[in-house]
């Protein structure tokens, strides 16, 4: 099994699943015998798929793949995580506001970094 790094700040951007949602996800993965969607990584650090990866730790026989994405920096990665999470249907209004705020902060930092480079 590939050992991926878990970044607490990245993981914090991902709203937790309810117990029922987590159990359903685990059942689906076990039924398929593999992950249907690859885990998203940046420099060997998990960006998307934290819940699936946690399930894989309990079931190392399950096949999975990873898709590496390129980001210039942590802020760009956080902005991507927030945009991706905002596409989820089960977010509460509070979770949406939090993610929008974090996305805005991260994109503002990215813009500042690129402005200083030019």
Spans of model-derived segments:
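Amphipathic, charge-rich alpha-helical segments that serve as recognition/docking helices
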Residues: 10-22, 26, 31-32, 52-118
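Short, conserved phosphate/pyrophosphate- and ester-handling motifs at nucleotide-, phospho-/glycolipid
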Residues: 49
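Short active-site oxyanion
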Residues: 41-45
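N-terminal BTB/POZ boundary and linker segment
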Residues: 34-38
């Amino acid at each position: 099994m590939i050992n991926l790094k878990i970044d607490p700040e990245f993981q914090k951007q991902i709203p937790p699943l309810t117990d029922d949602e987590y159990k359903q996800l685990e059942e689906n993965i076990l039924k398929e015998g593999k992950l249907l969607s690859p885990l998203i990584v940046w420099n060997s650090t998990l960006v998307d798929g934290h819940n699936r990866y946690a399930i894989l730790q309990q079931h190392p026989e399950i096949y999975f793949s990873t898709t590496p994405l390129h980001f210039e920096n942590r802020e760009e990665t956080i902005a991507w995580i927030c945009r991706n999470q905002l596409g989820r249907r089960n977010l509460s209004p509070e979770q949406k506001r939090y993610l929008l705020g974090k996305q805005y902060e991260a994109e503002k930092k990215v813009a500042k970094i690129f402005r200083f480079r030019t």
